[in-house]
Every structure is written in structure tokens, then in C-alpha cells.
């Protein structure tokens, strides 16, 4: 493998029960870890899975298992992780304890697209083949975020914004674009090259770079239209109000996002630039609205 095909050695982690009953009648617990792939990755990133005895579901077991995963990665030529992203709020405290013991940064974030796709694949192809499999959903997904959106922090509010779209094929070269901050993703398999990818452009003549730094820290997950508001979901459960919309704009943007979810694998983007005419980006993030989120 090529160790350069991970982004900053970030890992995405899920430690939770699976729809499989063990011999003792208890649900199987499993740790899944995957490295976050770079936008131009051409192979499956580092992955690690380990079952946990139901009586040992605690931070001590998790710490040891993540340490084992780190050793496996190093032995296989992958870089050790610096950060762990945890997407389940119910497991946040336990993962934080394990990360602290291992001197790793833990980020509570749903920017775990590679992990969620792997989880979906295991739900469809792996778990049903296991003895003790319980038909039904993999595990209850996190409850839909219901908190009212709050205005974006002042540090991320620009002078203006616009709604835009880019052909999917253009995003293949996104890693070559001049950008001070970015969060790029591999293009999903089976995506048509001319599929429009909708997104938000934010502009600020004087503060574009600072805005980009702040937005990256928010861990942007996906854009959606809620009533007549454009909302950015971020982190583990944050909802940020980007802008109020008139009825025509709300309908048009919601339609673009719906089409992307149906035909474009849920791909979206956010760009921050000094002006609409500027070619370079202060920041550029790709996001996905996928079913598990």
C-alpha cells in the first residue's frame, strides 16, 4: 500500500453492537476502524475490525484494541493515526477516554463517510452470513438532529454567498486546486462524470482565509433546506443557519440537493473565496448526504 493515500493519518471509528447474537444470548460488539482516504486514493484504505466480548465493553478494552490497530497499521506500512473521528454521540465519552490514553486527538464528527460506507457494506454482505444474525437494521442510527439551527459564527459569516454547481468530473482534480484549507473526498464509484454537484460559495474580500480556518474547525457534514432556511449540519450534532431563503430559492436549492442525493451519491461542496471572480480558494470542502447520516 501507499501510506501517502491517507489524509493526515486520520482514522474513523465505530465501536458499537451489531445485529448478531452470540452463544450467550448477548449482542456482539465490534470495533471498526478505517483510515480516511485521500481524494486521489486508488485502493481501499487501512481497515481494522475486532470483536469485543459483551462483558468487556469499556474504555480499557477499547484502548487496547485501538493500540492493536495502530500496531497493525505500522506493521503494514501505514502511518500511525493522529486523530480519531467518532460519529456516535452515545460512545463519545468512552472513545475520548481511549484516545486520551493513547495520546490521540478525538473529534466528535459525522465526517466519517468512508466508515459509514464500510458499515453499510458489512450490514448488507457480512453480518447476514454470520451465525446468530438478527434480521433488521444494523443498529439504530443516531436520532435525527432536531435542534433549531443557530446563526453561523461571526467568524464564518462572509460578505455574500451564492448557490452553484460543478460537474463531478471537475472535482477529480480538486487536490490540484490552489486552496489554503480543504477537506476533499474520493469521488464515489459509479458517479457520472457530468453529474452536477451542488454547493455553497461564500465570499469575503478581507477575511476569506480566516473564514476558511474557522469553517474547517466546524467539521462540515452536509447542507440541507429546512423550511425556508439553508442549514449546514456539522460536527456530531451542530446545525448552523447559513441564510434565510425566499420560497423560490428554497425550492430550487432543495431540488438540487435532492437530485444529488438520488443521482449523485449525495455529493456536495462548500467553497470560500475572496470574490466571485477569484480563481483560488481560501477553503474547499466536499461533503456527502448519505442515508446513514
Regions found by a protein language model. Name each.
Residues 1-293:
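Secondary-structure boundary/capping micro-motif
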